[in-house]
Structure formats: C-alpha cells, structure tokens
Amino acid sequence: MSVTIKLNPERRAKYRQQGFWGDASLADYWHQTLQAMPEKIAVIDNRGTSYTYATLDRAASSLATWLISCGIEPGDRIAFQLPGWCEFTVIYLACLKTGAVSVPLLPSWREAELVWVLNKCQAKVLFAPTSFRNTRPIDLILPLRDQIPGLLEVVAVDKLSPATTAPALSQLLRDTPPLTKQVNVHGDELAAVLFTSGTEGKPKGVMLTHNNILSSERAYCARLNLTWLDTFLMPAPLGHATGFLHGVTAPFLIGARSVLLDIFNPLDCLALLQQERCTCVLGATPFVYDLLCTLQQQPHDISSLRFFLCGGTTIPKKIAQDCLQMGIKLLSVYGSTESSPHAVVNLDDPLSRVLNTDGFAAPGVEIKVVDKERNPLPYGEEGEEASRGPNVFMGYLDEPELSARALDEDGWYYSGDLCRMDADGYIKITGRKKDIIVRGGENISSREVEDILMQHPRIHDAAIVAMPDERLGERSCAYVVLKAAYGSLTLEEVIAFFGRKRVAKYKYPEHLVVVDSLPRNASGKIQKFLLRQDIIQRLGEEVAHC
C-alpha cells in the first residue's frame, strides 16, 4: 500500500541542486558499500551473532525473496519488534531490497500499543522474537490477529528459543534463495515510519523518505568525521530514531561496523566497548550516568573511544565534567524523530560549548527561534525551536491535522521545545512548551528547577510536574530519587537548598515525593504524564483522609 508524499517543489529543487537529495535509495548506498568491502564485519551483537557485509546481504536477499513471495510490494509496511540483534538489520535490509517500508517497534510494547500501531501503519508482516526478557513476544501477538485484519504473516525470530507457533526466521533464511533482481526505488519514496515515543498520548508515525534518511545520516557522519574505520556501539533501542538511524543506518552508509546491545547494562556495555574497540557510543543521559558510575567503581579500557554522543535530554554540567575527568569526550546532539539530528557540536568545540549548548545546525539545516505567533526572535531570547532542511520528515502517517500543526507549508518543523540561540548559531534547549508550570500567572520552567535539584548532593534523579491548586492554578511538585547512600530528604531541606541557590521563591518546589525510580520510556525520557496522574491521586487520598 503506497502513501502519497507531499513534496514542496521549491524545497525539493533546492535540496537536489545542493546535493542533499537525489534519485538513489538506501538500498543503492548499501550495494555501494557491499561492493567496496564485502568481507568486512558489518554488524555484531552481544549474543554472539555477526555478519560480514557479504553474508548480511545474502541473508537479506533471501528474506526479500520470501517477502515478495508473500505478495509484498513497494510501499507495503513491514513491522519488526526486535531488540538490538543482528536480525534487525537483516529485516531492515530486506525491506530496502523489496521497496517495503520499515516500521521498527519497541520490544517493550504490549497488546494495546501493538494493536494500535500495527493497525495504524497497516503492517502486512510482523517479525517478533520467540523469547526475550522472560517473555514470549510471538505468543503475545498471535491471539491478537483477529484485531489486526491487515496483518498477513507473523514470523518468529528464533534467536533465543525455537519457534513452535509461527514460521521461523532461521528456516526462511535457510530455505529461500537470494533475490536475483533488486526492486528499483526512488529517493523521494517512503523508507520508514518511526513511531515517536512521546511522553504523552498515542505514538505518531513519523514518515521518512530515503532522501530524508540519507541527508540526515550523511550530514551527521560528516560533522563528526565518522568513517569506515569507526565502530558504533548502540545501547539504545533500535525502534527509536537514535538506534534506527545512527546505530544501524549510518554505519552501513560509510562502511563502518555496528555493535548492538539488546538489554542495557553498564557492565555489559563497557565489556562490549572494550572487547570490540568501539570508537563511538550513542545514547541518552541515563546511559552516560550509569556508565560513569560503573567506570568509577570498575575501570575498563576505553582508550578506543573517540566520543560519547549524548542526546534526548540536555546534558547536566556535572555529568559532562565527570566525563572529562574520566577521559570521555562527551558531545551533545539535538534532534527529534521528525528532524533527526539537526544540531550537533563540533569535535573541536571548547568544553564551554559542550557544557552550555546543544550544538548548531547540521549541514543543510536551518534553525530559528520563534514566538507564539511563529515570528523569529532575536538572539538570546527564549522561544520555540524550529528547523527546516532535507532531513525534516514528510508528516505524520494518516494525521493531516497534526502534521499541519507541526509542519508548515515552507517546510519548517516546530518542535515544541523551548530554546535560545546565540549569535554564533549555537542553541540551548531550555524546556518544553508543555513543560511549563503556570503558578498564579508566573511561568516556571520545569527544566530550570530540575537542573537545580540535580545539584543537590543527595539527589540522583529528579522531575518537576504541575499539581493542581485551587488558588494559584498550579504549584510545582518535585519527584526525586535519592542516591544510594542517603535514606531521606524533606521538603524543608529542599527549600533551604533553593534558598542558597538564590533563585526566585516562586520557583521553589512546593511538594516533594521521594520515589525509587522515575518512569521513563525506552529512549530515556521521563513520562511526566504518569507523575501528574500520580500526584493527583496522592492529593485525592490526602483529602479523603482529612
């Protein structure tokens, strides 16, 4: 099933003239790399599986033959709910070879998410593991088939246990001959639908063309001087933009090696880094924090590491400084599934840039900061961040109204993130438009208050959310996770700490909840809607006991 992609003719002509867009597809780039280095290791995972470029191509070609035999045509959606395994790349490449659209799904999704997303994207084939994390995902999906009428085939990825209820991927690869003729796909056609893991609401399907992905990853590799000599370590989920684009796609575009980790554990991650001599690691702030804590207690040889690229959330200064002391070059990157990545620091930027900014526009990308009416703001003023470039998505799948709100006719994507830009074009993300607490008419940035909380010596993790207040409308509530050595923290102690920080009193947290952990999605973002639900429930219980 094809999807009509609306391309702005002027933008398309400009990007083609500048060389960011062309006729070639991702499959064309794959074959260029394959011809150049067939015997090089392309991908390896922590379960011991590895493929050279040649063996990976043969496996993907066999799977492509099977997909075509099932009636799969260019534009049809193929979903795969896999962790960081080599088989993810096999399926992805098979989609490219057939012209099918890749729809990677998160392993953590269960019945509700799967039914909704698979129907939304009208997937015709789903690949799921026989077992993973003490569950059997394939057995979870089979009883749901009646609720997903468009799903024609379900394939069991029998990596950790045998397939008994669905066709096994391993057998399909053994029994099916390789594809003899590649399906021709144009660069303007849809390559992938990535469902955003937003902290609120149902996931939205972000539509990316081959040209979107190629321009994004080529610019990303160029800015960071990534080459065929590099080895990428990807601990983040491959169902998100970070893993899918930077952990799987970018390496094969430049002939590099991809090292995948299915379950993040700092010890396992460091062991892989040391064993495979990885040169770059990509992940959100929680990954960095956990690796740092582990390194401080159990040193590993990380001399091969060129840098750790950190995105998803702003890097706390303390973490950046600790990384520097441990010999880790920490670089900030900013982007979203809709526009990924579009701001990156330079490799040779001074530490002040890493600590105080989220980078500047990638090649071909424009960034501006706008007010509520979407008028550009002067340097230094806070407003909404917007980006335009060859990497920017084509809209949300079957969501024209949402697409129109986020993406204007001139190609600008409005992120919903609050931002400041300096005179050199470097940006600093300061929060979310929706992440503002309005207390008696005064706006409080949750990010600002969280940054102060994270400086408290007893606090390991923190989040600020609004709690309802009859008189002021909203007050701020702090959810904190304490460091292991500390057993308690009171609101009075927090207020005293804020007093020492000399910030306006209206920014002080007015309620404190100490928890064991904060709810995060797979990309590391705090799910604040769950915290808002929790504080409303807690307040209701307090009233009931009065």
Go through each PLM region and give its residues.
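AMP-binding/adenylate-forming catalytic domain of the ANL superfamily
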Residues: 152, 156-157, 503-525, 543-546
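AMP-binding/adenylate-forming catalytic core of the ANL superfamily
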Residues: 109-116, 126-128, 281, 389, ...
